[in-house]
Curated annotation (Swiss-Prot):
Protein's name in the database: Small ribosomal subunit protein uS3
Taxonomy of the source species: Bacteria, Pseudomonadati, Pseudomonadota, Alphaproteobacteria, Rhodobacterales
Highest taxon of source: Bacteria
Gene Ontology MF terms: mRNA binding; rRNA binding; structural constituent of ribosome
Native source species: Roseobacter denitrificans (strain ATCC 33942 / OCh 114) (Erythrobacter sp. (strain OCh 114))
Quaternary data: Part of the 30S ribosomal subunit. Forms a tight complex with proteins S10 and S14.
Length: 235
């Protein structure tokens, strides 16, 4: 079962929480959900050069708080904050609530599944060998402290006539262990021969406490540096 389902959805409320954090009545739920999807699609399209990893949307009373996790915050902020102000005005037109826009830097993009997948996709679109791109991503993740990583690519690899799937794994990726902190992402690369799907799993360690915010705390620990042995769960 753990090998088939989405690792993030399987671990919601165990060691990870939702990216949309709000409650709405039945009559408003559909409109707010469509608004969330529109905001996410717009941000990923508008800021595709900034390496957007996650977009978290919270809705306290009559407000909309959007937090963008990015590997290159300077690209979004721009010179003297000009670009982020323009982005804020565009997003504000998509919602009737008061908008608050926050930018959070991803200090270790090599440990973020979405950013690793985007990097591989960009290399494939530049005609880099898929084996070289996969191996480079795996080596960088392990060098930065990941305990395990798996990368799958599927499609007309290298321009082959018949589509196939190739994968590369290093370390442990325990998909059946609920306390395992596993980041997952699916990205598509638009090559001259067609679409190539890229799936990335990154195992960062085990989270022992059952708290929706535990995953965010663990991610912050990884960004700040490795903890000494014996200071928490298994390393």
């Amino acid at each position: 079962m753990g090998n088939k389902v989405n690792p993030i959805g399987m671990r919601l409320q165990v060691n990870r929480t939702w990216d949309s954090r709000w409650y709405a009545d039945t009559k408003d739920y559909g409109d707010l959900l469509l608004e969330d999807l529109a905001i996410r699609d717009f941000i990923k399209k508008e800021c595709h050069q900034a390496g957007v990893a996650r977009v978290i949307i919270e809705r306290p009373h009559k407000k909309c708080r959007v937090t963008i996790h990015t590997a290159r915050p300077g690209v979004i902020i721009g010179k003297k904050g000009a670009d982020i102000e323009g982005l804020r005005q565009k997003i504000a037109k998509m919602t009737a609530s008061e908008l608050h826009l926050n930018i959070v830097e991803v200090r270790k993009p090599e440990l973020d599944a979405a950013l690793v997948g985007e990097s591989i996709a960009q290399q494939l679109e530049r005609r880099v060998s898929f084996r070289r791109a996969m191996k480079r991503a795996v080596q960088n993740a392990m060098r930065m402290g990941a305990l395990g990583i798996r990368v799958n690519v599927a499609g007309r690899l290298g321009g082959a006539e018949i589509a196939r799937t190739e994968w590369y794994r290093e370390g442990r990726v325990p998909l059946h262990t609920l306390r395992a902190d596993i980041d997952y992402a699916h990205v598509e690369a638009a090559t001259a021969y067609g679409i190539i799907g890229i799936k990335t799993w990154i195992f960062k360690g085990e989270i022992m406490e059952h708290d929706p915010a535990a995953r965010d705390r663990k991610a912050q620990e990884l960004q700040d540096g490795p903890a000494p042995r014996g200071a928490g769960g298994r390393r």
